[in-house]
């Protein structure tokens, strides 16, 4: 039986630390409350009246009786008043009232601990021969991907529950567009898009056919392949709908961040590289452009091998990780660009004629800050999806970080509960304990057979195809939605 050993101990220790330290030490809370982000405080009615050159109206009892319900008329001020919002650093007390703050803190902290577990596991496998142990890091990576999708679903459900139907229509439109694109991508041959889905499905179906025949079942492989691809296309449509608003928001914060750093050309270059990083990820899975070109680069009348096949796979993994780290390092610029929307809205209001209620100004400025964690999740989750899909691809797909010859990786071993000696029974319950031992042995034998069958079905070839396609698809969805967002904010918003 395979034991988790050191990995299980470290994993349980990480879970315990995460649970106990969350109220005291949280990376997610530090990201928003380290003093680098500045929020804008909404003006009070007294400040607005002073800028408008009048006093705060006092309502008499007679006016309240005439209004019927004791409500005073809303205070209005001219839109072109000389209003300048006061900025203050975001602190912990401010962050506690933000929308989806609990979900944000839990997800980001879990991703940080998952990264630590992954780094420990990689170091552990480089020192110890742990081929018979379960790769706990891959489980953490898969869980992080699932939790990211769950959080995006919570955000999207918020749009569907709102009274306005515009956000719901956008999600549905991107979902149907993603469904069409996914069906087109899934019929492209492996000679052009080298996900490895076909070899992965072939391995899965062949192994499952052997398993089904042993159980006495007959099934049709062509029908199963078609149904699996249709199901995968539906999942792609769902992911595309989830990534619609994160891409649109990324486009807006990118444009504002570039404008905000107009006097810092190096930051602008990094922002543009970060924005175009999904395009680089997409190109790296196009075989004629990436692998074939680097494997047989034309040099006059001859061709030169710049990278071997295994070295290219490692370079691709490293490139994706570096691009994700770059985008994570630029998080603060995007978040500050979003917070600056409050001052940007005030400047736009000054150009308009007429009057506006003071409560509307206060509500608009406050609403921008209240959705800071939503915008942070929309920026970070696509990055985490790509990053942890790539890490899972490396671990479960038996890839290597080195540029030399590809070494066989670690295939997840079946998780089998270890049997511990039962306590010594008394004379009165010998028969009950014997029956219990027989039940436990039967359960262990059944689980052993089940996990052995799953290990034979889910091979590294299958995991390579699934996680390579997931990584590529998330990057493609974000590129499509963000480019549409650039077009929307640059042209449609000004017309």
Curated annotation (Swiss-Prot):
The keyword Transmembrane helix applies. GO terms for cellular component: membrane. Keywords: Glycoprotein, Membrane, Signal, Transmembrane, Transmembrane helix. Residues 121-135, 189-227, 287-305, 389-465 are cytoplasmic. Residues 1-28 form the signal peptide. The chain crosses the membrane at residues 100-120, 136-156, 168-188, 228-248, 266-286, 306-326, 368-388, 466-486. It is a multi-pass membrane protein. Pfam families: Tmemb_161AB. It comes from the Eukaryota. InterPro entries: Transmembrane_161A/B (IPR019395). Residues 29-99, 157-167, 249-265, 327-367, 487-495 are extracellular. Glycans are attached at residue 34. It is found in: Membrane. May play a role in protection against oxidative stress. Belongs to the TMEM161 family. This is Transmembrane protein 161A. It comes from Danio rerio. The gene is tmem161a.
